[in-house]
């Protein structure tokens, strides 16, 4: 299947500059193509992942992806989709962010073989361009009226836009022209808000490389959820690729909780499952939605892809333990992942009567309530029901000598660590 046909059935194409030309080009040649990301933060979130998934599909089809990390453009900030001016970051912070993104993106692509990916930083070819060179060699090629008409600028004219952000599209166009000239890059991929920046690059290539220069642009639709909320966010905020910001367990849970109305769309966008495999899962959503086979597949595929097989196994283990209540088999690391958002208490490293211990920590409001809950079998320590009012809490009640998991009733969890 032609990669363009595959992207179309996946619903992953919003706009392209020359469909017939690009389709023919990718059928007949191995092409280089790129997608960029600015280091505005130290981690990608799953919304950033969308265009890079397209880039990876091109690699799977035998083409060469170029991943551009914007060490230069990141110092300015892309005005696309922003209602107000970005705050500029220090060069030191941007450099740190660049390295963090390099690590994350390095896990997504193959860097060996005939279709090996490459990673570039636009700071390398931008840092020595003087202001006079910029104005003479590049600024001269851009018509201000055309720049003002592009959505990325027009949407900001009422509230105002600095020359810095106004000039962003010139810098991004310089990137495409540079990669065309030195890396034989023929295609730029981006989100739907990048159309103006991409077409600016194509115009510059034609002016610098000649009217017969073959280059293309392709954008991806804005991904929306069936309930109208923004994709990529949970109640706790953005879903990050950095495991220190969003644990693999939380990452897995985000996908497993996907709405039935969205899951088939996400399978097409984010996984490498075939059309037949996705069609089969779509049927199960219709006939056996309670089994959540599509969500389980989506969560497993994404956790493996972004993290690892080991991280998936860990997420499944935590999920199973929380569902069954058998938490004793969890490691300290797994407990930190699975109980990240539950009320947490710090206890003295001493022995104590269970009832007193629950009240001292604040898990129970009073001794009377604590005795009642223990006596009724409503208190569980590390998954085991406790009904002995005289029980002494000691080191044997700690997992890896670090944590005690308390459950009150069926679902109310508390995590206790020790001084």
UniProtKB/Swiss-Prot annotation:
Its EC number is 6.1.1.1. A motif ('HIGH' region) lies at residues 39-48. GO terms for cellular component: cytosol. Coiled coil: none annotated. It holds the Pfam family tRNA-synt_1b. GO terms for molecular function: ATP binding; RNA binding; tyrosine-tRNA ligase activity. L-tyrosine binds at residues 34, 168, 172. Residues 352-418 form the S4 RNA-binding domain. PROSITE patterns: AA_TRNA_LIGASE_I, S4. Keywords: Aminoacyl-tRNA synthetase, ATP-binding, Cytoplasm, Ligase, Nucleotide-binding, Protein biosynthesis, RNA-binding. It is found in: Cytoplasm. GO terms for biological process: tyrosyl-tRNA aminoacylation. It is an enzyme of class 6 (ligase). ATP binds at residue 233. Gene3D superfamilies: HUPs, RNA-binding S4 domain, Tyrosyl-Transfer RNA Synthetase. The keyword Nucleotide-binding applies. InterPro entries: aa-tRNA-synth_I_CS, aa-tRNA-synth_Ic, Rossmann-like_a/b/a_fold, S4_RNA-bd, S4_RNA-bd_sf, SYY-like_C, Tyr-tRNA-ligase, Tyr-tRNA-ligase_bac-type. It catalyses: tRNA(Tyr) + L-tyrosine + ATP = L-tyrosyl-tRNA(Tyr) + AMP + diphosphate + H(+). A motif ('KMSKS' region) lies at residues 230-234. Its main location: cytoplasm. Homodimer. PANTHER family: TYROSINE--TRNA LIGASE, MITOCHONDRIAL, TYROSYL-TRNA SYNTHETASE. Catalyzes the attachment of tyrosine to tRNA(Tyr) in a two-step reaction: tyrosine is first activated by ATP to form Tyr-AMP and then transferred to the acceptor end of tRNA(Tyr). Belongs to the class-I aminoacyl-tRNA synthetase family. TyrS type 1 subfamily. This is Tyrosine--tRNA ligase. It comes from Listeria monocytogenes serotype 4b (strain CLIP80459).
